[in-house]
UniProtKB/Swiss-Prot annotation:
PROSITE patterns reported in the protein's UniProt record: P_GLUCOSE_ISOMERASE_1 (PS00765), P_GLUCOSE_ISOMERASE_2 (PS00174), P_GLUCOSE_ISOMERASE_3 (PS51463)
Keywords (A to Z) from UniProt: Cytoplasm, Gluconeogenesis, Glycolysis, Isomerase
Family annotation (HAMAP family): G6P_isomerase
Pathway: Carbohydrate biosynthesis; gluconeogenesis; Carbohydrate degradation; glycolysis; D-glyceraldehyde 3-phosphate and glycerone phosphate from D-glucose: step 2/4
Domain of life: Bacteria
Protein's name in the database: Glucose-6-phosphate isomerase
Family: Belongs to the GPI family.
Gene Ontology cellular component list: cytosol
EC identifiers of the protein: 5.3.1.9
Gene, per the UniProt record: pgi
Pfam families xrefs: PGI
Length: 530
């Protein structure tokens, strides 16, 4: 990566000039067959169309140069080969590799060395251990409950939901993440504990929410006359407080170099997916992810799908100045995927410190959010079409449905109607429509992209997961920030312990005056009502 900085790159000035008058998507006939073909890329079963982005050949050329100047390919090579990429210069930091790609490299026997080879070999061993465990115990349980928060819940939950429509399963799966006791209590009301396997996921083995929820659920099992070790397994780092086979039925390992939000292809996602759908389905997901890992190493942006998507996002964020971006999958199976991408993107790139340790002077991660289509058309699309802010949209769609069941009504299937709506929204946002009634007028020039595959399968889902991981990481490399730590989550947790001490009467008076004032207000006003 070029250490000069994002703003000092020669292509940054060129792109700033080009952004003064970007392509006008409302120009009649501009979204032509020629433009659609020119501004598209098909790789690994996916086609990305960006003809409805506010780009022309000059912009794409400058983005290509910027990617080269910022050393995106070499940085991706460094990450996948196990070099230390999680660091901040001259300050204490985690200072370690980011090796989520190694958790699936073994399925394609990708040649690796050093740290990457070590994690790939360990991942293969853990996968075989999981396969053996499932062979021995999968039929003994009808239900699995995964306890974990952040990356230990969002990614696995999104993947489990995504595969539900294409992979038969007679297993029930639940996730408990929130420290709110109602979360765990609701799950406990719905399960037969005697037939339930609980997997507790925590890298450190000390995550507060996870530890509390495990104890909450274990207490209920004990009251049912069930033994902890017969029903609880763990996924954690070697040597953590949870790495105890005398306590758990089984313990599976992850490693410090696997970030939580990037851990779904490790045992963090493998156990629950293997239990729900079988080991072979998890293996197919790994194959898709590994294929996209290789695609992310392509040296030219014109052949590198996640890099192209990343640089289009850079154009929208840093040069057109759009502060937020919405992800809209036209697939019921991707119901929870936007929430996973929200964490992956904003926790990775929601930074204002460069890896040089300096405060940066430009925008980084946009606010990410989303919902499936067509549901979202009936909620927030009003704002996308006519709101005061321009919000770029990333559409995700599939030509065929997962379950193979459909019906023809008024000459078209439901799948065709779904796909037609996605394409129509992209065109409508770009072109707009004039009307003498200003309330019915659409100004257009609302950029979007469409990422399309044939069908959502385990392989496709793995590739889609890795596509977004690499898109996010490429943007971090371009900005020169550390996409692999999350110091921003620590301050609130530290203060929560102080507040809890005040609530328990264990803190010295004046330890946190702000908390004391707020607690006094809420206790006095709410107790009056009760």
């Amino acid at each position: 990566m070029d250490r000069k900085g994002f703003l000092d790159s020669p292509s940054t000035k060129i792109l700033q000039d080009l952004a003064v008058a970007p392509v006008d998507l409302t120009t009649p006939g501009i979204i032509s067959q020629e433009r659609v073909e020119r501004f598209s890329l098909s790789i690994g079963g996916f086609t990305l169309s960006y003809a409805t982005e506010r780009v022309d050949e000059g912009v794409v050329s400058a983005l290509t140069d910027l990617a080269s100047e910022r050393g995106l390919v070499s940085s991706m090579q460094a990450m996948q080969s196990g070099e230390v990429v999680n660091y901040i210069d001259n300050f204490p930091s985690e200072s370690r590799p980011a090796l989520h790609t190694a958790t699936r490299a073994w399925v394609k026997e990708i040649p690796l060395t050093g740290n990457a080879e070590d994690i790939a070999l360990r991942s293969k061993i853990e996968a075989q251990r999981l396969k053996d465990f499932l062979h021995q115990y999968r039929d003994a349980f009808t239900t699995i409950v995964q306890i974990g928060i952040g990356g230990s819940e969002l990614g696995p939950k999104a993947l489990h939901r995504a595969l539900k429509g294409c992979c038969p399963s007679d297993k029930k799966v639940y996730f408990v993440s929130n420290i709110d006791p109602d979360n765990a209590a609701e799950v406990l009301q719905e399960i037969d504990c005697s037939k339930t396997l609980v997997v507790t996921v925590s890298k450190s083995g000390t995550t507060l929410e996870t530890a509390v929820n495990e104890e909450f659920i274990a207490d209920h099992f004990l009251k049912q006359g069930l033994h902890f070790r017969d029903h609880f397994i763990a996924v954690t780092c070697e040597g953590s407080p949870m790495d105890d086979r005398s306590k758990y039925l089984e313990v599976f390992h992850i490693w410090d170099s696997i970030g939580g939000r990037y851990s779904s292809t490790s045992m963090v996602g493998g156990v629950v997916l293997g239990f729900a759908y079988g080991f072979d389905v998890f293996f197919q997901l790994l194959e898709g992810a590994a294929a996209m890992d290789l695609a992310a190493l392509a040296p030219q942006m014109s052949e590198n799908l996640p890099m192209l998507a990343a640089m289009l996002g850079i154009w929208n964020r840093n040069f057109l100045g759009y502060p937020t971006s919405v992800i809209v999958p036209y697939s019921a199976g991707l119901e929870y995927f936007p929430a996973h991408l929200q964490q992956c993107g904003m926790e990775s790139n929601g930074k204002s410190i460069a890896q040089t340790g300096e405060i940066i002077g430009f925008a980084t991660s946009p606010i990410l959010w989303g919902e499936v289509g067509t549901n979202s058309q009936h909620s927030f699309f009003q704002c996308l079409h006519q709101g005061s802010d321009v919000i770029p949209i990333e559409f995700i769609g599939f030509l065929d449905n997962q379950r193979g069941r459909d019906i023809v009504i008024s000459g078209s299937t439901s799948s065709q109607k779904l796909f037609a709506n996605m394409v129509a929204q992209s065109i409508a946002l770009a072109k707009g429509r004039e009307n003498t009634n200003p309330n019915k007028s659409f100004r257009g020039n609302r950029p979007s992209s469409l990422l399309v595959a044939e069908r959502l399968t385990p392989y496709t889902m793995g590739a889609l997961l890795a596509f977004y991981e690499h898109k996010i990481v490429f943007q971090g490399f371009c900005w020169g920030i550390n996409s692999f730590d999350q110091e921003g989550v620590t301050l609130g947790k530290d203060l929560a312990n102080q507040v809890l001490g005040i609530m328990q009467g264990q803190a010295k008076e004046g330890a946190c005056l702000e908390a004391e004032a707020l607690l006094k207000l809420f206790n006095s006003t709410q107790k009056k009502k009760s």
